Amino acid sequence: MAASTSTSSLSVVGTNLSLPPHRHHRHFHSPSSISTRIRTNRLFLSSSLAFSSPRDARVVHAGLGLRRNTPDVWKHYSSVLSQPTAPVPVRQSCTSCCLASAKKRRSNLPRFVPGAFFDSSSFGLSKDKLRHASVKRVQLPHATVGPDEPHAASTTWQEGVAEKQDLSLFDSELERLEGFLGSELPSHPKLHRGQLKNGIRYLILPNKVPPTRFEAHMEVHVGSIDEEDDEQGIAHMIEHVAFLGSKKREKLLGTGARSNAYTDFHHTVFHIHSPTSTKDSDDLLPSVLDALNEITFHPNFLASRIEKERRAILSELQMMNTIEYRVDCQLLQHLHSENKLSKRFPIGLEEQIKKWDADKIRKFHERWYFPANATLYIVGDIGNIPKTVNQIEAVFGQTGVDNEKGSVATSSAFGAMASFLVPKLSVGLGGNSIERPTNTTDQSKVFKKERHAVRPPVKHTWSLPGSSANLKPPQIFQHELLQNFSINMFCKIPVNKVQTYRDLRIVLMKRIFLSALHFRINTRYKSSNPPFTSVELDHSDSGREGCTVTTLTITAEPKNWQNAIRVAVHEVRRLKEFGVTQGELTRYLDALLRDSEHLAAMIDNVSSVDNLDFIMESDALGHKVMDQSQGHESLIAVAGTVTLDEVNSVGAQVLEFIADFGKLSAPLPAAIVACVPKKVHIEGAGETEFKISSTEITDAMKAGLDEPIEPEPELEVPKELVQSSTLQELKNQRKPAFIPVSPEIEAKKLHDEETGITRLRLANGIPVNYKISKSETQSGVMRLIVGGGRAAEGSDSRGSVIVGVRTLSEGGRVGNFSREQVELFCVNNQINCSLESTEEFISLEFRFTLRNNGMRAAFQLLHMVLEHSVWSDDALDRARQVYLSYYRSIPKSLERSTAHKLMVAMLDGDERFTEPTPSSLENLTLQSVKDAVMNQFVGNNMEVSIVGDFTEEEIESCILDYLGTAQATGNFKNQQQIIPPTFRLSPSSLQSQEVFLNDTDERACAYIAGPAPNRWGFTADGNDLLETIDNASSVNNNGTKSDALQTEGAPRRSLRSHPLFFGITMGLLSEIINSRLFTTVRDSLGLTYDVSFELNLFDRLKLGWYVVSVTSTPSKVHKAVDACKNVLRGLHSNGITVRELDRAKRTLLMRHEAEIKSNAYWLGLLAHLQSSSVPRKDLSCIKDLTSLYEAATIEDTCLAYEQLKVDEDSLYSCIGVSGAQAAQDIAAPVEEEEAGEGYPGVLPMGRGLSTMTRPTT
């Protein structure tokens, strides 16, 4: 179960100033997942306006952001067609509790850092502008505001504190401006709010993405903050017992519904994602509501279920007790030391969890689970609002009525309590509001039980100016599992509810200011040895914590920590004192407006779950909820009133707790917390004790603030990377043209009407696939895939490809343009680009807007990377240092060191699948890494795919101009020279290993892995299984459905002869095994909280593997491993059932249907369509996908299972245990270590992120 953190970063109530939630599809990667795809903290060409939260910033950064893939220890692309999309969980899962970020979901909409800046924009407060703004405001549709949510976070300053405003205007203009800015923002026109007589509130929002599905979430306003001293963790326990004990919820699983739950400080949420109807056209909403009613208000606290969940939670507690979790706890403990938030973490206390009986748990439920303390959200393809309201009343109307006592009369419909009990309900889409009548006999009823007026019910100590005597000294958390230095400086203030245009204007000005700071700091990656790894400033509202927190987070190598602090605070002070320049104001204001315009155009593409999350968080914070169009119009209305002086004044207030540190006028930091290692590696001396004191930290801050400062110079931003005259010369010289797509076909253009896919090939050998899609308005994505990847590294050049890709990204330059100029070009043109390396491929992916020639700008950038990339020694030094840090951090991670030891054993020590060692890194030169990367960029080894809302003429013009003029001709010869990876010969003494890690706390994990074929049926020992199976099928034709895929028109190829046979059947098998592992190892035996099965099916390399990841306790981990092995092998004796196969099909087909309108998903479908190294990928792999799933039989799935090597001689396992028993240290030698996901030892950005617990399924 996973907890949710509701941090809304500069959340602007639907205005799109806040980053849209990035959907993780409720798929949480546990530590055991060990997916080592790294999203680096050091971004390449990253222009960012995303300051909601540093962790959001990575989703949105424009520029060539390096999304680097290290050797993926387990997981390759999850899709059957190799698209790197986040998978949707296949079964219900209960995600509960701990300090996790509410950013757990993000929108899957393409999100750009907004771009081109209007030089003609004026920011003066002219009468025309004010009048124009007023018109914009009154044209916006309004709906009912709904009840005044009493659970919104407190926004009250302590007495005597007031906001300062200084506007130099004539009185008449000021009066007009004040009148406009003081008016309320509009409300979402389609959002319907209401309340039943028993107090349950409901919100209904029609939304057709995805079609024929809806989200139903029941939010109970109780969390860990409401627990007494002897109840720590009981809210989470109830969530587990109520959710997993519901029989009605279980019955929904056969309909294709998914369910989940989570617990946080301030609330517990149960949610169901469901089809709108069954196959028999029965309405599913009543059944879903009935299940939520049972879960929330009528759970069975059976002793057997309580014991099951007690074991699961204790396992979860150990599993999530990573060093990241412990760091997050430290941050929250110091940030909120004055209230219960510092000591009520949702996971609870082990000694208390072991003790509670059913009576104790039931009493907490009775105290807090009552109708007036719950809110129901329904968002989805709901057509009939009155019918939905009636269904809600039918299911929940009588709940709790008989149990409530006492009444207090209220006669005024305008009183606070009347507003609470008798909200308005908007029934028209145009926003006309009416009162929904309620039973008059119940209008006077007030309930004995009422939710807290403020959620969470805690009192904060705000960051106010004060004497240095009240300054808390920096706190230091030191631990042997930490690798790098990090420090967080916090400022805590009340939430400013965004209700008026003035509130929105302030948020806009903050975003502009912080955008400038982020860009400036990112430009400091110039020296060979930069003093910091990352510097992030986060200014965000938190509904879960009931406050707004500004956080400066600095991470660095331990040896550089003092310089890192000096640089960061110096830059903060410089921005605070001099402010942003006029050019920066113009650039970032216009960028934000363009981003807002883009999201407004995407209003019909926002998923139901993203809309629901946004509404829930906005209500918790007291923000006005608007739709994307309203938000954009409101933003336009206030943008014309923004001035440079005001932006700098508002921004300075955000930064003064750091910039004026030590002065009486400065707000006192809420906390300063440094998290540091106990020992560090020093060249020539080995491991040495790391010493640091609070005084040294304070001195470093003061030293940085005392350094002289200079104003920021204006940068010249290129309008084009390829001049028109240069382009014309290239076209004259190289004569770009299309040639026949293949030698067998004379046609130069192949268009498939059914899929809309067009295939082309350029004269320089580059194949191109494109698809015109209107699903994402004025948006496009493009991916260049280059074959080879790390597999092409020679035995004398290990690490050359992965370090080379990193070197290219570190430099960030093309042609004669500096890194800063390229970054700003990306901002101006709303380009987001990532560079990635895997075992098989190098890829560049671009997201762009079609507005203002954004696609042409993206193609210009791609052209420059191909033709004029710049390689520098200092960039290589930085890349080498990054991987050296990765390597040294492995022994400090239980999961990564355990996984690494297994991988080394299974793949016979092949370093291409692990991090490069220090000796390999030392051998690399700039020329060797450049050659390793760029030698793969030749025409017949590349493929470009584009999907977007463009025309045929637009896309083909860009293809010819910028790809056709690239000197990509040549043949990639390395394919024959690549040494194919192999599995270690078995049996081997390394097939069963253990790792022990010194730690203060006990934890355990294990991995089980073995060989599998690749996606197309090839194996490491040279067999072509597809050919074998197809021959057997033709000889032994028994008439099963798999032998002929009947569709409209002529029958298509049989499944067993189809190239995707293994892609389809292995996907189904994965779902089935995952379900069995959960049912057996987790639910029946109680040996783990988290267990999963994943397949890594390569496309180019002729092998694959599976891995089972399991977490447990040291006392149970061996039994858990044995149980997992039994499940893996049990499919022989306990065959697959029709019900299991049907559920797996439904899950995968639902995932396909949910993603099919996404540009990014189509980009994955197009991958390798013309790749010479993936010859079996053809159009049928896309066109037949649905029918292939439907046609698969149990026999087909069993054939796939036979190709998984699960026998004792083929299977590898490694068990990792951490604790204080140093004598048991059996960890792998450090020379073999490799790194995992993220900056190892560098803490994840954002409070509470790592403390999210894992799904139960």
From Swiss-Prot:
Q: How is the cofactor bound?
A: Binds 1 zinc ion per subunit.
What GO molecular functions are on record for this protein? metal ion binding; metalloendopeptidase activity
Q: Which InterPro entries match?
A: Metalloenz_LuxS/M16, Pept_M16_N, Peptidase_M16, Peptidase_M16_C
Q: Does the keyword Magnesium apply?
A: no
Which Pfam families does this one have? Peptidase_M16, Peptidase_M16_C
| Subcellular location(s) per record | Plastid, Chloroplast stroma
Q: Which cofactor does it need?
A: Zn(2+)
UniProt superkingdom: Eukaryota
Q: What class of enzyme is it?
A: hydrolase
Could you mention a single GO BP entry for this protein? protein processing
Q: What does this protein do?
A: Cleaves presequences (transit peptides) from chloroplastic protein precursors. Initially recognizes a precursor by binding to the C-terminus of its transit peptide and then removes the transit peptide in a single endoproteolytic step. In a next step, pursues the cleavage of transit peptide to a subfragment form.
Q: Which PANTHER family match?
A: NARDILYSIN, STROMAL PROCESSING PEPTIDASE, CHLOROPLASTIC
Q: By what name is this protein known?
A: Stromal processing peptidase, chloroplastic
Organism of this sequence: Pisum sativum (Garden pea)
Which gene is the coding source of this polypeptide chain? SPP
